[in-house]
């Protein structure tokens, strides 16, 4: 993540994040903590590859994810990483109910909205198509899904995504969650 991160030290990152969140709030803007549980220990860029972080859950929670624990009541939203943490789950965090429902919502007590990262990124393609990625993200605990880098097709990708979600709902592959609806 390099220069896109506040700092290597979780305490410093926490202080800087609090300052940014305060400034955003004063300007009338919401905040989003990203990329849960952390993106700092991988070399690969999830825009172009599928990063893998082989650390244990204990190590991740003690380091990268620590600011999420400290800031869970202050964050308006969180965006999970398209990173695989195989010692925790075989799926990238954004497609993992263990990361989103059990750890982020359950263990850390986060109650805000969860946005997927861009489903057109290479790191998201492990789920398959954009529709498959959206279903995986929504079923794992995301409240909203993002398809950001498809603007050159005149909206066809977004239309296909919406059609796919409607078909999935009609066939029972996806059921909108009432709690998730309320967070939107």
Predicted regions and their residues:
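Second-shell residues forming the walls of enzyme active-site clefts
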Residues: 8-175
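Short, intrinsically disordered, charge-balanced linker/junction segments flanking boundaries
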Residues: 175-184
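A glycine-rich phosphate/pyrophosphate-binding beta-strand-loop-alpha-helix module
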Residues: 1-4
């Amino acid at each position: 993540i390099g220069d896109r991160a506040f700092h290597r030290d979780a305490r410093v990152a926490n202080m800087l994040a609090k300052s940014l969140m305060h400034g955003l709030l004063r300007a009338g803007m919401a905040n989003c903590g990203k990329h849960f549980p952390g993106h700092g220990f991988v070399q690969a860029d999830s825009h172009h590859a599928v990063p893998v972080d082989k650390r244990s859950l204990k190590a991740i929670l003690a380091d990268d994810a620590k600011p999420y624990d400290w800031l869970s009541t202050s964050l308006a939203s969180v965006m999970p990483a398209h990173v695989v943490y195989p010692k925790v789950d075989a799926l990238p965090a954004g497609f993992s109910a263990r990361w989103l429902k059990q750890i982020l919502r359950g263990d850390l007590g986060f109650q805000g909205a969860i946005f997927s990262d861009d489903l057109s990124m290479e790191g998201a393609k492990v789920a398959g198509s954009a529709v498959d990625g959206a279903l995986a993200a929504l079923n794992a605990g995301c409240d909203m899904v993002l398809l950001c880098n498809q603007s050159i097709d005149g909206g066809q990708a977004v239309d296909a995504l919406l059609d796919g979600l409607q078909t999935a709902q009609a066939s029972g592959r996806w059921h909108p969650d009432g709690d998730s609806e309320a967070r939107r």
